């Protein structure tokens, strides 16, 4: 009986078995092909083009081509007042606008040496953790549909709708919130907001377990993701990975724990990493598991914030909001833990203008995507879909 084997070295090997001995019959030479994947439609993972260099069905490497969604974010920042930049940050990672706003405001507040009311800090954590869960639901749902599973996608978007309703109730928008302002918030949360958030936490906790089991107990999903796109921890660190990507490689690094900001030092939560029992540490399945387990930790954080939050009596969400931002001369870099990793802002001020001299965003999506060449090496073409989905990129943040 003849068997075909792809060597990945420019040939297809034809063998036959004689008893327990494998006999080589011949090597069939193959030519390198260059295949273009994309640019995909923005409704998928974004306008990304991958140029795949293949040897038969094996990918020798894949190179991402970026820039299709470039909107001159950093140049816009040089001609817009500090508060006016907040809506632009919403449009970077548009699936996690609250988190992006917060990262930028943290940087400006550090430059201004502002001290915020504790109620503002707790509200910021609640809305950002809600947005983190919503973002992970999109990541998990679209990842499932990438691999051919439609039902989990519907479940994820059903539960995400509850979060969007809560965020709309607080901010007035389902996406692109412009809610977290420099020095405070646009508005205080409604009177029954905490009660409805608690109801959502009680509702979603069993749903998160159900969603976890729906995919991790699916044999096809596990076979499509386990052992695929493995990234060793040392290589991930050298690339500058962060967030679920780095934790999926077994590195327990989370800015909320390792370089805490706001009230996170007062909160008790775990940083999930794969143990290697169910997945191969660093593979696509590990990255999925981290996101799935993180949602439960976010629920715990939200509950603690509701219990510890000061009352609203006499509270003004704009009490520390400066009427006109004119930062002192200097520079600052501040980073925050976004759903896709560390989002950092470097801001330079000349001390005279109400606009930053320079505003540079450090995008975790861009850094994570830069490892595509290593992730794709030696993989089959269908496995590229699993690898891209596991990165969970948002091209609005990659291209800016």
UniProtKB/Swiss-Prot annotation:
EC number: 7.1.1.-
Cellular component terms per the entry's GO annotation: plasma membrane
Domain of life: Bacteria
Pfam families: Complex1_49kDa (PF00346)
Matches recorded under InterPro entries: NADH_Q_OxRdtase_suD (IPR001135), NDH1_su_D/H (IPR022885), NiFe-Hase_large (IPR029014)
Subcellular location: Cell inner membrane
HAMAP family xrefs: NDH1_NuoD
Free-text function comment from the UniProt entry: NDH-1 shuttles electrons from NADH, via FMN and iron-sulfur (Fe-S) centers, to quinones in the respiratory chain. The immediate electron acceptor for the enzyme in this species is believed to be a menaquinone. Couples the redox reaction to proton translocation (for every two electrons transferred, four hydrogen ions are translocated across the cytoplasmic membrane), and thus conserves the redox energy in a proton gradient.
Subunit text: NDH-1 is composed of 14 different subunits. Subunits NuoB, C, D, E, F, and G constitute the peripheral sector of the complex.
Listed name of the protein: NADH-quinone oxidoreductase subunit D
Name of the gene encoding the protein in the UniProt record: nuoD
